[in-house]
């Protein structure tokens, strides 16, 4: 039976798992690598899930009402998801972000009708968060969803992303890998999968140049969307079994490779997840095992970066 959808938000979630056969063959690995393609969400990334969840929760609590203004510090994808959901729901959106974010991301936000306030790149996400809080004080009837502290973020992954992976693999998942930005994905999916099978290994991925989880050190890096430079409240640090760090170069290399082996255009943080998936797949104990890597977004918002430069 064909279905007509009443809102773009009804199309969020239910993203496909792709068996990355060509990519795996290129690396000669004997594990099964499955890619969870989050760019199939309507605004192109995994963050559509949390944008919808945070807005719906705020509407339920009375924090958002007709005429409210959504203000959020974002490195891009959460802003794009919120801009889309805000447009569909009739809210004004103001987004603060470091000036280091790609031009495509800024233009996308404007295309959805959101207003952008750029902050000092050297201050990273902390600078964007401070600016959002300052704007919220000046703006009546405003609400900050606060993706780095909002429990609706990990909760939506526990409710949707985790079960989708479990059902698609019929419970045959040995490793789950996700990059850590807010930590909502690795937390929600990790908690769900471990509740079904405590032997599932959950791997957190962070930039080699900003190894906050593994070494307690923050630094500048080029893997947009992960490695916020601090440990977010939304991250359950006891859910993952291991942290893998990925270099800028490997994130770019594997992201580009995936486009050229699988014909699927994914972003820089997806490249980081794929690099970690190959690292796991090369281990002798991973032979014959199933590795699910969550690929957060599409590559078309990185055409101005080094991702696809030969």
Language model regions located:
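PLP-dependent amino-acid enzyme catalytic core
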Residues: 1-310
């Amino acid at each position: 039976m064909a279905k007509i959808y009443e809102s773009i938000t009804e199309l969020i979630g239910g993203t496909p798992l792709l068996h990355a056969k060509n990519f795996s063959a290129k690396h000669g690995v004997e594990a099964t690598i499955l890619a969870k393609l989050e760019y199939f969400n309507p605004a192109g990334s995994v963050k559509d899930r949390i944008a919808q969840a945070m807005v719906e929760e705020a509407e339920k609590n009375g924090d958002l009402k007709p005429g409210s203004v959504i203000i959020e510090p974002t490195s891009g994808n959460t802003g794009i998801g919120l801009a889309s959901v805000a447009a569909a729901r009739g809210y004004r959106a103001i987004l603060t972000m470091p000036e280091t974010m790609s031009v495509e991301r800024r233009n996308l936000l404007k295309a959805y009708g959101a207003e952008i306030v750029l902050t000092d790149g050297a201050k990273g996400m902390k600078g964007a968060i401070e600016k959002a809080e300052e704007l919220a004080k000046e703006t009546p009837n405003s609400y900050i969803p606060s993706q780095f502290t909002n429990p609706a973020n990990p909760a939506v992954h526990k409710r949707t992303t985790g079960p989708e992976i479990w059902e698609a693999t019929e419970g045959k998942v040995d490793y789950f890998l996700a990059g850590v930005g807010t930590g909502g994905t690795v937390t929600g999916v990790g908690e769900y999968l471990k509740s079904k099978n405590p032997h599932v290994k959950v791997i957190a991925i962070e930039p080699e140049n900003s190894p906050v989880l593994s070494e307690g050190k923050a630094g500048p890096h080029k893997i947009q969307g992960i490695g916020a430079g601090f440990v977010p409240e939304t991250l359950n640090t006891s859910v993952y079994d291991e942290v893998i760090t990925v270099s800028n170069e490997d994130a770019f290399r594997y992201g580009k490779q995936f486009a050229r082996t699988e014909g699927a255009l994914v972003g820089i943080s997806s490249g980081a997840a794929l690099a970690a998936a190959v690292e796991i797949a090369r281990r002798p104990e991973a032979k014959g095992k199933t590795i699910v890597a969550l690929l957060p977004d599409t590559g078309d918002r990185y055409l101005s970066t080094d991702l696809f430069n030969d």
